[in-house]
Amino acid sequence: MEMKEKIRQKFAERFGGDGPMYVAPGRINLIGEHTDYNGGFVFPGAIDKVIMVEIRPNGTERVNVVSLDMDGEDSFGLTEEERPKTHWAMYIYGICREIIKRGGNVGGFDAVFAGNVPTGAGMSSSAALESCFATAINDLFNNNEIEKFELAWPAATPRTIIAAQTAALWTSLYRSLAARTT
């Protein structure tokens, strides 16, 4: 079964019904890793590995997320300072918090995601995850009124929240490749 079908099946099983799907590519830096935040040059490119998410507003102030790759589930609130329990959900939490902080709208949602971007291999699986969710939230809760360039900043911030490391802007700029899919 393909990734998309697995996501659709789990979403229907866990939350009932369906929602729109979004996809974002992983990336490589053709001239080496870690050069961006060390003041060096970058030459990034998208790859054929992706993160895909099915997501739907749930009419609450809670975010409920299932990760097929991590075999896990997490939930957190939007109105209180309740952090997720899992490391991977911190990226989604960071996106939500930063969009709200910058004046955007975020409501509760249910989501299931999976991907084939290798984790820990320098192909930006976390950036692809952030990109998917930032694009989906912009579409579902802000009518795509947040410009792609502006959306790059909220997508960069979760790295600061999680790893106390400033994300480089170029890593975030490739997020403009994220899109709604059918």
Model regions and ranges:
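ATP-binding N-lobe of GHMP and related small-molecule kinases
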Residues: 2-127, 131-148, 154-157, 162, ...
